[in-house]
Amino acid sequence: MRNTARWAATLGLTATAVCGPLAGASLASPATAPASLYAPSALVLTVGHGESAATAAPLRAVTLTCAPTASGTHPAAAAACAELRAAHGDPSALAAEDSVMCTREYAPVVVTVDGVWQGRRLSYERTFANECVKNAGSASVFTF
């Protein structure tokens, strides 16, 4: 009987020692700082000749990071980020420039965008009739 009382006391003290700090930690967790102050926006953009990204070899690829500041290997990162912000991160919503005149030559160019925009996964592919149409379709995002 005395051994049972000792075991019960030992288990009670062990449970208090192990679980006591955990209870205090759960009370303190709402006061801790958030892991990140902004949602990540980091993209990889590619361009290649062909009708589909599956069959076209990428000719060029750039990185574009838009949060917290515009950076990456994209030659006009700040302008490209501003255009994507205006389109709410949707590359298909980028406004085409009406003032650009392009030939009707068919030399397909495919662009892809893969990555994360404001914490959401993004995957986009579009085929343009030629390089001129691609550059007119987005002032900065696909001009690299």
Swiss-Prot record:
Family annotation (SUPFAM superfamilies): Subtilisin inhibitor
The entry's keywords: Disulfide bond, Protease inhibitor, Secreted, Serine protease inhibitor, Signal
Disulphides: C66-C81, C102-C132
Any single Gene Ontology cellular-component annotation: extracellular region
UniProt keyword annotation of Protease present: no
Keyword Transport found: no
PROSITE patterns listed in its UniProt record: SSI
Annotated signal sequence range: 1-35
Assigned protein family: Belongs to the protease inhibitor I16 (SSI) family.
Site, as annotated: Reactive bond: R104, E105
GO molecular function: serine-type endopeptidase inhibitor activity
UniProt subunit comment: Homodimer.
Domain of life the protein comes from: Bacteria
Protein species of origin: Streptomyces lividans
Subcellular location: Secreted
Record-given protein name: Protease inhibitor
Main function: Strong inhibitory activity toward subtilisin BPN' and, to a lesser extent, toward trypsin.
